[in-house]
A protein has these predicted regions:
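Bacterial N-terminal signal peptides that target proteins for export
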Residues: 1-2
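Processing junctions and N-termini across compartments
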Residues: 6-9, 194
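Residue-level detector of solvent-exposed, low-hydrophobicity positions
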Residues: 9, 51, 63-64, 83, ...
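C-terminal motif of bacterial Sec signal peptides marking the signal peptidase cleavage site
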Residues: 10-14
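Short, compositionally biased
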Residues: 15-121, 192-205
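Secondary-structure transition/turn motif
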Residues: 68-71, 180-184
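An exposed tryptophan-centered "aromatic clamp" motif
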Residues: 104, 108-125, 130-182, 188
Length: 205
């Protein structure tokens, strides 16, 4: 992996260092708008503003937004096999890096391709890593409240597909990806050809 893991709060790790462009407004539950600005739920004007998603994780060097839209249910891959350069740590915030690796893999990756085809005012959406989905689950009540305010699609109870492979063994890395349950955040090893719910995330730098 080209990315280096560094410790951040909550027992999660970030793949690389980032710089904030939104200092002062990076707060879980705040809303990302189509014009690249951020507002609080109280300051959101549905008649004059277009919401893109809701911040579900914010720290000194990383902020992550979850889309207002579900994309449906897709398989991690159409066949079994290890995808190179995909981080297999269930704690890391590496959705963007993992998605990039999936998209250039020789293995067809329907979930990552669905995210790549997602039409939005913002670019660079990713299939979230297991660590990112765990972070989302931890803050789901706050995020769901803001999502309701902006008219976003509710989060389903059940398994969401992550971009993370199960790296327990070389065999498991070939066969399984990690899915994360909402709202519990419970992580499960799932056969790569088994579909899971897809909800894109976006990293703010």
């Amino acid at each position: 992996m080209l990315c280096m893991a560094v410790a951040v709060m909550g027992g999660l790790a970030s793949c690389e260092e980032h710089t904030d462009e939104y200092e002062g407004s990076l707060k879980v539950g705040n809303i990302l708008l189509a014009d690249n600005s951020i507002v609080s739920p109280q300051g959101y004007d549905s008649k004059n503003q277009t919401a893109v998603g809701v911040i579900f994780y914010a720290s000194r060097d990383t902020a992550l937004v979850v889309s207002r839209y579900e994309l449906g249910s897709y398989a991690y891959a159409d066949s079994l096999g290890t995808v190179g350069s995909v981080n297999s740590d269930s704690r890391t915030l590496c959705g963007a890096e993992n998605t990039a690796a999936l998209l250039v893999s020789e293995i067809t990756t329907p979930a990552a391709e669905a995210v790549a085809d997602f039409r939005s005012p913002m670019a660079s959406w990713a299939l979230p890593s297991a660590g990112e989905l765990r972070a989302l689950a931890a803050m789901l009540p706050v995020v769901a409240h803001s999502m309701e305010i902006i008219g976003g699609e509710p989060f389903a109870d059940g398994q969401y597909i992550s971009s993370t492979q199960d790296g327990s063994t070389s065999e498991s890395e070939q066969m399984y990806y990690l899915s994360v349950a909402m709202p519990s955040g419970f992580v499960t090893s799932t056969i790569k050809t088994t579909p899971g719910r897809v909800r894109p995330v976006l990293r703010l730098r």
